[in-house]
Amino acid sequence: MALGSDMGSRYSLRPEFYGGTRHIQEVWSMAEELGRQVFGAEFCSVAPLSGHVALMMALYASVPRGGKIACVDPGFAGYPGLDVDKIPQVLGYSVIKLPEKEMCIDVEEAVEMVSREKPHAVVLGASLILYPMPVQELAEMVHGYGGVVVYDASHVLGLVAGGVFQQPLKEGADIMLGSTHKSFFGPQGGIILTNDTRLAEKIEENTFHKFVDNIHFNRVAALAVALDEMRKHGKMYATRVVENAKTLAESLEKAGLKPFRNRLGYTFSHQVYLPYQVEEAAHVCNILEKNHIIADIGVRFGTCEVTRRGMGSKQMGQIAKLIALALDGADVKKDAVTLANRFKSIKYT
């Protein structure tokens, strides 16, 4: 209801520039306060229209033009927006790629590289994120030379909110940001959080008429609702999401497939990864979609939506069997639809 409300055609600025916007201002402040509560932060901005915009705003506030950033390689599992011809080109940054090992950042090599290169910001986050990032291991050293740690929680924001993944701000990240529609079950949009007063001020002063103007207050209202739901039910939701991901991975293995795992296990997040070469991955994705099972060209699976519809470990086993059968040539469309139709109501509200 909030997302489809009349606020979708209204806008406001602080201080109250437009008359008749008192209730919009109240909703705006409510969303920020809920964000501070849920994530344990002193500052929260709900102005970004996406996680991408939130990342640009965070970097603009912490890295000068001509500066250097370090990030997970976009060609490996990192965010494509940090490729050299994307955000870095727009904001005028050079980029170094953090070394990886078994789908994790290689901490020893990363510490050595960052100590040598001294990037203005180390961006920790990835599009394929199975395991926690080494925030604590890098933060003390980065802070020692005056750099900042920016944690892009876009994919794991709901798990952070639920307290079942790492807690970046407590571990030393200066800024945490993310999109609000992935593991966090809100509307499309972005959020920025920090406990650093100086960075908060820089983010605020560079927000309006630089990165955004109208911040879509129907979105802000819907985000406030989602934040309140997460405040009440986040722990239970996030716990079940991760449990379902682990069960799905184990069930895929039992069904004869080979989900990625390293010495830590299959996953600590909502994601499960089936590693294929690029051309084969596209074929796998296409087969699954024809059978009403949605993955991406990765091949990544996520357990957030099925969890929010009330599915548990039993259904993860059923889904794994359907995936294996489909990839073995069977037509499982009807079975997939039948399973989905048994779980139509939304939980954790």
PLM regions with names:
Residues 1-18:
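N-terminal "arm"/small-domain region of PLP-dependent enzymes with the aminotransferase-like
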Residues 5-10, 210, 244, 248, ...:
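A short structural micro-motif
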Residues 13-18, 217-218, 348-349:
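Short coil/turn segments at secondary-structure boundaries
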Residues 16, 184, 264-268, 288-289, ...:
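A structural signal for short secondary-structure junctions
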Residues 19-26, 30-258, 304-311:
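Conserved PLP-enzyme active-site core in the AAT-like
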Residues 211, 291-295, 327:
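A common structural junction motif
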Residues 227, 238-302:
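Conserved small-domain helix->loop->beta segment predominantly found in fold-type I
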Residues 243, 247, 299-349:
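PLP-dependent enzyme catalytic core of the Aspartate aminotransferase-like
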